[in-house]
């Protein structure tokens, strides 16, 4: 080891801790003042322009409704245009001044440029960009039959946020706008059976934290890390080991396991409220924060917990028989599941065997 790094190893750790001890009280005070001001003076979204990707269902749909209640002008982006039309009508009844629907695929760079350009042509400016589109998977990395679907996971979960951001930056800069990105709790929590998804979301978190430093205060960035929320993913929409995107009950049960699933509307309300108050991070539900402490201080215990919950014999056996809700530790699963998912579960388990 060279002399310089040897000296830095001796000096930097104690000096850094000493500086933190002196700086923390002042930093905590300023943060408290900042929090109070944000509560009082939240951003008024009336008449402002908001683009929302992945707006055809789940969190994206509910985020659209939350902005509609704040009387914003909306641009709804997704591949399923027929779904966007019905969401547009509801958004109008909730208070949205104007709603533009654009069918586009965020994995295609030209589509991302197109919906940014169409937004500017329609409204003349852009205030908020909400990058929400995403796709999960539920298989162990070693279970993948080939690598054909790997790139698509990165395309939709990482590039699907980066492409719109690239084309929107000049317009957001002119309005001192804001980027809101759904990075998911898996961006920092290593959930088993989702290695590719976790990696993509971790890249999202790192990208936007770095971008925040690069652009300074010209554009604000809110990174949302929601946990299990009722959505297409918690209803069983995953990429399979073969690279196909399907709705399947079995992987949903293996993936979600005994975790409680929160309501989408409440999650969206928290994200939009946090963004309008200028929060750098929005975490929902808050109880997931305890896992961050585990990750930092006792990572071995976190690893053991996940193996117990997601990789043991009971889950593997139960998922094959569609009976995960009966395995030990998850017997009351339906009691902590939103109504929409309870109904889905009931329909799937009450269907006649001839249809299976």
UniProtKB/Swiss-Prot annotation:
It is found in: Lipid droplet; Membrane. It is a single-pass type II membrane protein. This is 11-beta-hydroxysteroid dehydrogenase. It catalyses: an 11beta-hydroxysteroid + NADP(+) = an 11-oxosteroid + NADPH + H(+); corticosterone + NADP(+) = 11-dehydrocorticosterone + NADPH + H(+); 17beta-estradiol + NADP(+) = estrone + NADPH + H(+). GO terms for molecular function: 11-beta-hydroxysteroid dehydrogenase (NADP+) activity; estradiol 17-beta-dehydrogenase [NAD(P)+] activity. PROSITE patterns: ADH_SHORT. Has dehydrogenase activity against corticosterone (11 beta-hydroxysteroid) and estradiol (17 beta-hydroxysteroid) in the presence of NADP(+). May be involved in signal transduction regulated by various sterols. It holds the Pfam family adh_short. PANTHER family: DEHYDROGENASE_REDUCTASE SDR FAMILY PROTEIN 7-LIKE, RETINOL DEHYDROGENASE-RELATED. Belongs to the short-chain dehydrogenases/reductases (SDR) family. Keywords: Lipid droplet, Membrane, NADP, Oxidoreductase, Signal-anchor, Transmembrane, Transmembrane helix. A motif (Proline-knob) lies at residues 13-26. The chain crosses the membrane at residues 10-30. Its EC number is 1.1.1.146, 1.1.1.62.
